[in-house]
């Protein structure tokens, strides 16, 4: 397995402390990788800064061609990437290969096209004898911090728009799931000029802090927890860096009495438990109107009970393990606290799986109240709660009564209600009669403590640029 860092176009071994990388399906150590040293972090940033002088002045066509080549090489090595993602994350292999790899390739191809469509405003005379124009220019060096739930996908979301806009990037994947990012580094080094892409390995304290705090870094992009976002914002405040934050969610799923119950059950069974629930948009916080509450709980419980956990290389496996032992304990603790309330009922699941690996049974909890921790706090596991509600006004208030603001969905046959409720929800994305659908052309991002900035779409590309005014006297 490729375990070297990419610094200034060269694959080099880390010079810091070695860290184990695990297979969460077995609990075994896959390999140990040496972290980047402080000197290597500095070298990577300085290489990116030096490369920016030329890369930032390339034409959109040149940048697009590089991104298209990278998309092609990922597609050609799709099986290799899927196997690495499966072994390092515990994802079902068929899901990694059939769902994630095509989406990752599409992200790079989309931004290759978007790079050639990014424009400033046309020139105009707003002062006599002077012509003004608006430019959208790259920022410089971007430090990108990717999470452990979708390592390669999130690397793509961060690399593609930053590079398309003309920035240079230093990427740090999670130390828990670094293997696909390191493999990507190996393939990218022969496509992009030296220093344009740099990939490091290490923990937040030893590598993330010196990277994000480096004076040559002009922007920090993070997908991670609220706590990590707070830390980076505080850590970088003195240097006034631009920050781009996607900090998780607790998606409300509002099910009205007139909803298609079978569609809701199928949707939540899939989108509440995909990737073992380790998804910031997971359909995990259901509000069911009282007229259909009992029916929904019964049917959804039966459906969730049929979800199959198993070995990632088994074609019939629907749920793999959680990413780490520490995360398994966090999820287990959250469910035990919910059970201890006395009013929350475990419909199915509610326990760790026996045997090796970090498996937790797909869980449905009924009778949760608005103020319960299981409703208010992100669990980030295969755990869905159901809360009954009376009317539209109440459920909109409850849905918005959250520190999160990333994703939401509304299930109803009433078109007017769908529009009315969607307009009032304080979430970056609202789906109607579906959930979890993402496309490269549409923006993904949140509000409130879920963060700010957009991934994907032309809005995502603009986030990696600075607006400049140029005035010419004539």
Curated annotation (Swiss-Prot):
It catalyses: 4-aminobutanal + NAD(+) + H2O = 4-aminobutanoate + NADH + 2 H(+); 5-aminopentanal + NAD(+) + H2O = 5-aminopentanoate + NADH + 2 H(+). Homotetramer. Pathway: Amine and polyamine degradation; putrescine degradation; 4-aminobutanoate from 4-aminobutanal: step 1/1; Amino-acid degradation. It comes from Escherichia coli O139:H28 (strain E24377A / ETEC). Transmembrane segments: none annotated. The keyword Cytoplasm does not apply. Belongs to the aldehyde dehydrogenase family. Gamma-aminobutyraldehyde dehydrogenase subfamily. Gene3D superfamilies: Aldehyde Dehydrogenase, Chain A, domain 1, Aldehyde Dehydrogenase, Chain A, domain 2. The active site is at 246, 280 (nucleophile). One of its GO terms (molecular function) is NAD binding. 4-aminobutanal can spontaneously cyclize to 1-pyrroline, and 5-aminopentanal to 1-piperideine. One of its GO terms (biological process) is putrescine catabolic process. This is Gamma-aminobutyraldehyde dehydrogenase. Its EC number is 1.2.1.19, 1.2.1.-. NAD(+) binds at residues 146-148, 172-175, 209, 225-228, 280.
